[in-house]
Design a protein with these regions (language model features):
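TRAFAC-class small GTPase G-domain
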Residues: 1-202
């Protein structure tokens, strides 16, 4: 079975390692959010077979947490050969959101054209209006700032396992929540792009 290389990328303390362990534990019946956090000292790698709506898919998942400040060449090495990138930022930290274009430009330079899921984590720290504003600003600015055609923005909470969805009115403050592994929406987006089919995790 062919595997797809998926890289978790972006600022530190944004949820990359938590997502890594969540994907690793997909076969378990329960997943409990661990409030304890330990920054990753070096990259983690795993090959995992996951069940999806189009059959089993093998992914090579790379977690680069802890390497954010160790130089561009090292980060380039992690990105090389990637089939897709999940770029994390912290929606409760303006600086983290401001760093998105820099990370995206590195992705564009090293692996041009790969699909990128930009994932704003920790939405549980925001009120409803702030959540809507975050969705709006990111959707307006991402492609303009970077010029990358295969970017999709998602607002999630790994802690609450939710994906926040803005309704049909772009400027409305009304939002809904997708639960039951909603925080894995970014991975579903990448796999759907890579397999030219709508992919849902089983």
């Amino acid at each position: 079975m062919d595997s797809k290389k998926i890289v978790l990328f972006g600022d530190g303390c944004t949820g990359k390692s938590t997502m890594y362990h969540k994907i690793r534990d997909l076969k378990k019946e329960d997943y409990t959010f661990d409030k304890r956090y330990k920054a990753t000292d070096e990259f983690d790698f795993m090959r995992v077979e996951i069940k999806t709506s189009i059959g089993d898919i093998m992914i090579d998942l790379w977690d680069t947490a802890g390497q954010e400040n160790r130089g561009g060449k090292l980060r380039d090495a992690y990105l090389k050969g990637a089939d897709g990138v999940i770029l994390f930022y912290d929606v409760s930290e303006k600086k983290s959101a401001a760093n998105i274009p820099e990370w995206l430009n590195q992705v564009k330079r090293v692996v041009p054209g790969v699909p990128v899921a930009v994932v704003g984590n920790k939405s549980d720290k925001l009120n409803e209006l702030d959540q809507c504003e975050s969705v709006k600003l990111r959707e307006c600015n991402l492609q303009r700032d970077v010029g990358h055609s295969q970017i999709k923005n998602f607002l999630i909470s790994i802690k609450n396992d939710t994906h926040i969805v803005s309704n049909s009115s772009f400027w409305s403050s009304k939002i809904t929540y997708e639960v039951e592994r909603g925080c894995l929406i970014g991975l579903e987006y990448l796999l759907s792009n890579l397999y030219n089919n709508t992919v849902k995790l089983a």
